[in-house]
Amino acid sequence: DALLMALRLNEAPVLRAVYQRVPVAEIPLLAAALPEPYLKRMLQLIAAQTADSPHFELGLRWAEHLLLNHHDGIAQARASYAPVLRAVHQAFSVQMTDLAKLCHSNHYALAFLAPSHVGLVEPTAMARVEKGEK
């Protein structure tokens, strides 16, 4: 009920607060029960929150369940949903790029630190593959 009221009010701070406080276990139920008129607004919220927030998995779960439950309606109105779906895709792409950069940075930092502790650190699967070991 709080989510629907926040969507009706359409106030950004209220929407953000309600969106972030929804328990993850309730997302599938709320996504299935979300009325069609609020779907586009909810997808816009996901795009905005994913771009501005560190709660990446929360956005992924919302998007997954909304798309699974409302795919027929979205497919029938492809043209009207195209901009918001592009915005969601763009937000996830930016997060994915940032996450990939962080992973590469950590990988190289560990590679730099690991030789200084020879014998203390077991070689990683990646290092064994690079050396041709199994």
Give the positions of each predicted feature.
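Long, low-complexity, highly charged intrinsically disordered regions
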Residues: 1-8, 130-133
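Short, charge-rich amphipathic alpha-helical segments embedded
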Residues: 4-33
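Extended acidic/polar alpha-helical scaffold segments
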Residues: 22-134
